[in-house]
Amino acid sequence: MICLGEVSFQALADARQIGVDEYWLLGDILMPGTGRRRILDLLDQLPITARVLGNWEDSLWHGVRKELDSTRPSQRYLLRQCQYVLEEISLEEIEVLHNQPLQIHRQFGDLTVGISHHLPDKNWGRELIHIGKQEEFDRLVTHPPCDIAVYGHIHQQLLRYGTGGQLIVNPGSIGQPFFLDAQLRKDLRAQYMILEFDDKGLVDMDFRRVDYDVAAELQLAKDLRLPYFEVYYESLVNGIHHTHHQEFLRELAQKEGCDRELDDWLKSGND
């Protein structure tokens, strides 16, 4: 997930300083966050060799078509974020973001690497959280077979193995890392991962964490009038994510005027 503004640039600066020569995008590119045009312009500058479809791209694609359930606070939150994205991003560009595979494979010598946002055939859900069932993780390395699986979605850096000894890793989230443990949650630096290969195989795995100016990002969110600002604040400052807390979202939408803005947009037809 790389939906933020300031943090994306800091993480990229770190990767460039190290000498990363290709980039993989594991989905959830634009929402929620301030990035929008800045993110797409940034990605255009990178040697991206792999990208897969995240669940937020699905939500964005359906949201701009006003196909989400506007009676649910969590869906209204998504719709308002989609409306915000449309201020800078065209429908054609959203179509490109959505027109990505769920899973791809890369070959490094004898090693096959599977890349997905979540499961090979499903980019949403909780099957691959840190306490997920082993048989669910095995799907990453058996459908089809691969030696290493890289996935996103859970916003947690993770390393574990398939039943057959295959390596399974998650680079975490550049935008909004997630921790259940309160002490770990005090460190909300941007997360990503570097994999280094040579002609013999996998040389190194480096789980990275990068500082960024949280205050600057929050000020940018205010300046750009990011909807549901308090949700964003809680994610960046406290590591608490409210995107599924229905009553919290309902009250915040009324407080910030998001309901009025969204209803006006929903009534405006397909513009």
Model-derived features: positions:
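N-terminal active-site segment of His-dependent metallophosphoesterases
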Residues: M1-L46
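A short acidic, helix-capping loop that chelates divalent metal ions and anchors anionic groups
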Residues: L60-H62, N123-W124, A216
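His/acidic metal-ligating clusters that form di-metal
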Residues: I18, E87-R160, Q166
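Acidic, His/Gly-rich catalytic cores of divalent-metal-dependent hydrolytic chemistry
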Residues: T163-D271
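Active-site neighborhood of phospho(di)ester-bond hydrolases with catalytic His/Asp-centered motifs
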Residues: Y23-D28, P32, A50-N55, S116, ...
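Active-site neighborhood of divalent metal-dependent phosphoester bond hydrolases
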Residues: L42, L46-I104, L128-L140
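Short, glycine/charged-enriched secondary-structure capping and boundary segments
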Residues: Q10-A13, R38-D41, R65-L68, I129-H130, ...
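Active-site environment of divalent metal-dependent phosphoester hydrolases
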Residues: I2-E6, M31-T34, W56-W61, V150-G162, ...
